[in-house]
């Protein structure tokens, strides 16, 4: 069997046998909202107790409460869920949409292309089997979350988000876990706690979006904005030369397991329409697309043959399928294209290069820019959010922050204000390849030019010397720009610039970017961000190995790395690891020092010995003569040498050997 067939067969087997997957020692829980049908899915990580005293026969333990964390996996992490990818996920938002009374179910699809696909019997074997007619706003109605927010309405989606973003912070009362630095937010104002009203205000202001198409009721509400947790997007999608529908559905499920807050389907190969339907119906997270890719397929890949009519039909096709946000390269203007001529790497955005070629071949202004108000009308009818694409982003650090890049950003700032006139939720896409010293300028200019609309960046990649490791080179920039105020990061995988990512690449990219996003949250001072860090640090200091693994982003890898060096069962409770060994573990030594100090204090209290303060000890030391100090040091030195000049002695060695023999 060829590698391609084998990969496809494995993907088919995966989705045929798909069962909910849970991380070790975790369970799916639901936090109840103000109404019966508002239940917010979270992951709860259970921890072992801490030994605080007693003896071998009567140990005394202190409980470590379970930790609640954000969970993007929807039904895929719920053992009680009945998953069938051929039927799709439960449409749990359907009732919320219907009860608002401002949408209607159409008799059939509106897109001419979709009508052609449905009439083609040759596609029956590929088609998602449980298709329903799409919804659209009633005449003269706007159905966007931005519209509701501006009307002062707190939707169920907004309440869901508030509960989710807080991560049960109010339940955590251990000062060890709640301690945090106030952070440096660079002007971001984060609610503490985050309330439904705060969510509404941020959406109404345009500082945050809730990307939820009315035709994607399976999606769980989430928010993108700099005053909330930094989000991460994963890219999937087939191409003309590789991947299949089965593989893309597998990658979707895999992405949500490892923390993708949104997923972009960047398919460019055959069966784009059918692949997208399977993805949306099985996605608990918002789905984004770049519609120009499919429009180009419809004109046989010839950019010059693109036109507004084809693109418009593509927007309606995708909106009625349930796409939650469109990337639109409307800022690539004819007059900006010559600005890229002296660049080292020219135009590297696929969508940007398509529109640049169209502009030059027709010597006309970008038709996406010319028809931008028409695009907004379509988006407003389905609550599709706009992600204004950065077609002029730099493809090398040599081209960073140049005239072309910032000219386009200025235009995007103008377009976002037009979108807001139509109550269309909008975010701004950013670079790209930017050295560390130029990253903050990008964030500052975006906030200024785009009136604080959320920023969504690809990296940025901070150096160009590491093909195969660009998840690292870009993760550095991603952490920095997340701290400065970026709302969502688009992941980069190890295959960036080299090939289409597989499952393992997707995982590596997501873990890298979840680290970057979390580091940004901690640095900004997000109220609930550092709790998980503190819990893991406490587990590490107390040598609760299983809790260390399970509180981390990737428990399986952490456990495998530890067991690779110390596979014995006894090593899972030992107070050292293979890095330093039993004699040089700094945390073990610290614990021994603490125990010694505590025992000494108890002895002094028992014997009525006056316990001096640090200042009193210093006063005594100051009164000693130099000769007295030297004599004391000499005596201690002689005692150390008499015992063999060993840092650790037989008792500690015997204790360690006993642990390893268990």
UniProtKB/Swiss-Prot annotation:
Species annotation: Shewanella halifaxensis (strain HAW-EB4)
Quaternary structure and interacting proteins, as annotated: Homodimer.
Binding site for [4Fe-4S] cluster: 577, 580, 585
PANTHER family recorded: PHOSPHOMETHYLPYRIMIDINE SYNTHASE, CHLOROPLASTIC (PTHR30557:SF1), THIAMINE BIOSYNTHESIS PROTEIN THIC (PTHR30557)
UniProt: substrate binding residues: 235, 264, 293, 329, 349-351, 390-393, 429, 456
Protein name: Phosphomethylpyrimidine synthase
Entry GO CC: cytosol
One annotated GO biological process: thiamine diphosphate biosynthetic process
Keywords, sorted A to Z: 4Fe-4S, Iron, Iron-sulfur, Lyase, Metal-binding, S-adenosyl-L-methionine, Thiamine biosynthesis, Zinc
InterPro entries: ThiC, ThiC-associated_dom, ThiC/Bza_core_dom, ThiC/BzaA/B
NCBIfam families membership: PRK09284.1, PRK13352.1, thiC
GO molecular function: 4 iron, 4 sulfur cluster binding; carbon-carbon lyase activity; zinc ion binding
Cofactor(s) in the UniProt record: [4Fe-4S] cluster
Catalytic activity: 5-amino-1-(5-phospho-beta-D-ribosyl)imidazole + S-adenosyl-L-methionine = 4-amino-2-methyl-5-(phosphooxymethyl)pyrimidine + CO + 5'-deoxyadenosine + formate + L-methionine + 3 H(+)
Function: Catalyzes the synthesis of the hydroxymethylpyrimidine phosphate (HMP-P) moiety of thiamine from aminoimidazole ribotide (AIR) in a radical S-adenosyl-L-methionine (SAM)-dependent reaction.
Highest taxon of source: Bacteria
Binding positions (Zn(2+)): 433, 497
Enzyme Commission identifier(s): 4.1.99.17
EC category name: lyase
């Amino acid at each position: 069997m060829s590698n391609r067939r084998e990969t496809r067969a494995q993907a088919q087997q995966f989705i045929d046998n798909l069962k909910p997957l849970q991380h070790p020692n975790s369970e799916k829980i639901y936090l109840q909202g103000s109404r019966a049908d508002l239940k917010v899915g979270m992951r709860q990580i259970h921890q072992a107790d801490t030994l605080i005293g007693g003896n071998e026969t009567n140990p005394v333990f202190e409980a470590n409460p379970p930790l609640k964390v954000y969970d993007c996996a929807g039904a895929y992490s719920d053992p009680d869920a009945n998953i069938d990818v051929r039927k799709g996920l439960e449409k749990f938002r359907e009732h919320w949409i219907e009860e608002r009374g401002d949408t209607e179910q159409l008799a059939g699809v509106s897109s001419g292309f979709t009508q052609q696909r449905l009439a083609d019997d040759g596609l029956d074997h590929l088609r998602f089997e449980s298709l329903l007619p799409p919804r659209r706003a009633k005449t003269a109605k706007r159905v966007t979350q931005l519209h509701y927010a501006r009307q002062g309405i707190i939707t169920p989606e907004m309440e869901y988000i508030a509960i989710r973003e807080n991560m049960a912070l109010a339940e955590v009362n251990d000062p060890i876990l709640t301690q945090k630095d106030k952070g440096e937010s660079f002007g971001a104002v984060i609610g503490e706690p985050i309330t439904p009203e705060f969510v509404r205000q941020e959406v109404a202001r345009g500082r945050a979006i809730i990307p939820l198409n009315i035709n994607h009721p399976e999606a769980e509400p989430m928010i993108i904005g700099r005053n909330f947790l930094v989000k991460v997007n994963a890219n999937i999608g087939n191409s003309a030369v590789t991947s299949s529908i089965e593989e893309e559905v597998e990658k979707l499920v895999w992405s949500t397991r490892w923390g993708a807050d949104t997923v972009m389907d960047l398919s460019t190969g055959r069966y784009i329409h059918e692949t997208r339907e399977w993805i949306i119906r099985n996605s608990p997270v918002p789905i984004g697309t770049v519609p120009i890719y499919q429009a180009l397929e419809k004109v046989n890949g010839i950019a010059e043959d693109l036109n507004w009519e084809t693109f418009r039909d593509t927007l309606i096709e995708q909106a009625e399928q349930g796409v939650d946000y469109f990337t639109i390269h409307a800022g690539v203007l004819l007059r900006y294209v010559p600005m890229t001529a002296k660049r080292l790497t020219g135009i590297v955005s696929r969508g940007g290069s398509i529109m640049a070629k169209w502009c030059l071949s027709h010597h006309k202004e970008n038709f996406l820019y010319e028809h931008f108000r028409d695009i907004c009308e379509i988006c407003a009818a389905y609550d599709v959010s706009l992600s204004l694409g950065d077609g002029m982003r730099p493809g090398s650090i040599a081209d960073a922050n140049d005239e072309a890049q910032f000219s386009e950003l200025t235009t995007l700032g103008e377009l976002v204000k037009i979108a807001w006139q139509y109550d269309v939720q909008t975010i701004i896409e950013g670079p790209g390849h930017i050295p560390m010293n130029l990253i903050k300028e990008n964030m500052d200019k975006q906030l200024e030019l785009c009136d604080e609309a959320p920023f969504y960046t690809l990296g940025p990649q901070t150096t160009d010397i590491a093909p195969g490791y660009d998840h690292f080179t870009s993760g550095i920039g991603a952490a920095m720009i997340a701290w400065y105020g970026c709302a969502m990061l688009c992941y980069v995988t190890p295959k960036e610039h080299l090939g289409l990512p597989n499952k393992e690449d997707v995982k590596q990219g997501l873990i890298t970017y979840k680290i970057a996003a979390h580091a940004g949250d901690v640095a900004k001072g997000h109220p609930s961000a550092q709790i998980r860090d503190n819990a893991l640090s406490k587990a590490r200091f107390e040598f609760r190995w299983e809790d260390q693994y399970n509180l981390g982003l990737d428990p399986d890898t952490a456990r495998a790395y530890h067991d690779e060096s110390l596979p014995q069962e006894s090593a899972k409770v030992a107070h050292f690891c293979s890095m330093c060994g039993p004699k040089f573990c700094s945390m073990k030594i610290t614990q021994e020092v603490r125990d010694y100090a505590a025992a000494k204090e108890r002895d002094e209290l028992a014997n009525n010995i006056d316990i001096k303060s640090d200042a009193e000890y210093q006063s005594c030391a100051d009164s000693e003569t130099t000769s007295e100090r030297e004599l004391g040091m000499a005596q201690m030195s002689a005692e150390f040498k008499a015992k063999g000049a060993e840092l650790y002695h037989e008792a500690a060695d015997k204790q360690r050997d006993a642990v390893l023999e268990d």
